Amino acid sequence: GFSARCGREMEEICIMDDATVEVTGGVITYVGPNRGEDRDGYYQRYWHYNARGKCLLPGFVDSHTHFVFGGERAEEFSWRLKGESYMSIMERGGGIVSTVAATRNSNFIQLRGKAEGFLKQMSVMGVTTVEGKSGYGLDKETELLQLRVMRSLNNDEHKRVDIVSTFLGAHAVPQEYVGRTDDYVDFIIREVMPAVVQNRLAEFCDVFCEQGVFSIGQSRRLLTAARDMGLALKLHADEIVPLGGAGLAAELSAVSADH
């Protein structure tokens, strides 16, 4: 048979004529020359698709998205073009803060309809699995609402994309907690995270570990609590300043350190 290609082996292209890809239970079980004619009962056991003249590709996995949110931030694009930094836009009420306000003012139907549109676009581009994050509520009600929207879309019998949900309550410090970041971390751990876990709304917990947002110590405390509650870990790490988020991800055996 054929084993997986790794490293420089992936540069080698193997062309097979009259080839077959067999899939059983959602798992690729054979790739190689067509061997169907020589096997008794082969045609009775499998569905057959003639892909002559076509290209068969694995579905893309988009492992970091924020596709459930309210509002738009198109005007910020021009600000960035003029050289304004991500953090300065956020400090004057733009960025995440702007989207939080719009998301809090959206209901389930509005958020679901918008998110479903994004998923359809992803599907057309070949995405079959997507990780989706909350993080535009920054309060208990809206964080849970975002995650419930994702669960609803994932349970839809007509869905085009599989969804893996991540709780990102520590995406930013909300206006009502400015200057009290430790209190906000306590609120997430004591009030929001248990509800996420009890309702089985997420598989992962993420945190924006960044200067001016959540420190290494605050991120460690939040992620340790998440791990103790049974959530796997992710981090937004070292996006703007090399704070040490990647090292924290390694320390806590996180699944990923993004950005």
What kind of region is each of these model predictions?
Residues 21, 26, 53, 64, ...:
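Divalent metal-coordination and catalytic microenvironments
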Residues 34-44, 156, 249-251:
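Short loop/helix-cap segments at secondary-structure boundaries that form the rim of catalytic
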Residues 46-113:
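Metal-associated gating/positioning segment near the N- to mid-region
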